[in-house]
From Swiss-Prot:
UniProt family annotation: Belongs to the R-transferase family. Bpt subfamily.
Protein species of origin: Burkholderia mallei (strain ATCC 23344)
Protein name: Aspartate/glutamate leucyltransferase
Gene that specifies this protein: bpt
The entry's keywords: Acyltransferase, Cytoplasm, Transferase
Domain of life of the native organism: Bacteria
UniProt EC number: 2.3.2.29
Amino acid sequence: MTHPTELPLSPLSALQFYATAPYPCSYLDGRVARSQVATPSHLINSDIYTELVKAGFRRSGVFTYRPYCDGCRACVPVRVPVDAFAPNRTQRRTWKRHRALVATVAALHYDEEHYALYMRYQSARHAGGGMDRDSRDQYEQFLLQSRINSRLVEFRDLDPAENGASTLRMVSMIDILGDGLSSVYTFFDPDESHASYGTYNILWQIEQAKSLRLPYVYLGYWIRESPKMAYKANFHPLEGLVDGRWKVLDPTLADLPPVDAALARAPLPGGHSGTR
């Protein structure tokens, strides 16, 4: 029988953290990556996930992780403080250009039209990476499984000449945290290569966070050496989690020491200090 004093003090203290085996990095060619995973997943609710995101974790489906790579710290968790955010000229033009898009917020759900757009996006933007061959089941596991407060947002162009007909332009998955919105994944019409739908989506999320009185929009990881991640550095001010502390980040000056040294100064939530 377990003595009462041996019970976890909180659900967060019941989590365990382990490091995965090395695997090829999906962001930087020739690099080897590892992840630190929080388990068991059924204990990670919205409150706990908020604390994990503050510590640099993200999720893919019900899999909650953060980079834990030997000798590399290219992945920097970043967030936008919405009240301090000031759009630049290009972002203001993008916002004005797409203001006619109609956004519909819904619970996570499968839609064949969404999946078709996802496959078009993967084939155009990430051909050969594996995700361009995702089955419907893989798509659902990746984007539509969540144990926290998550939403699906679809953006459509309405055609007034066609009696309410519309064209799906973008789909975005968002987590609602205690201190902000977390952008999980976004895919959009790849045929308009200069439409800047991804930028518009972040601007939309910033406005939503303001309306909900939430202070941050979490953008996942920024990787200086990855051209696909470069757009995140265009949002100012941008805060990064460096040496275990959130601070305003200057992407041109960011000095990123090896991950092992950084993690030693970045305690896990709930007082955890190591990886099993």
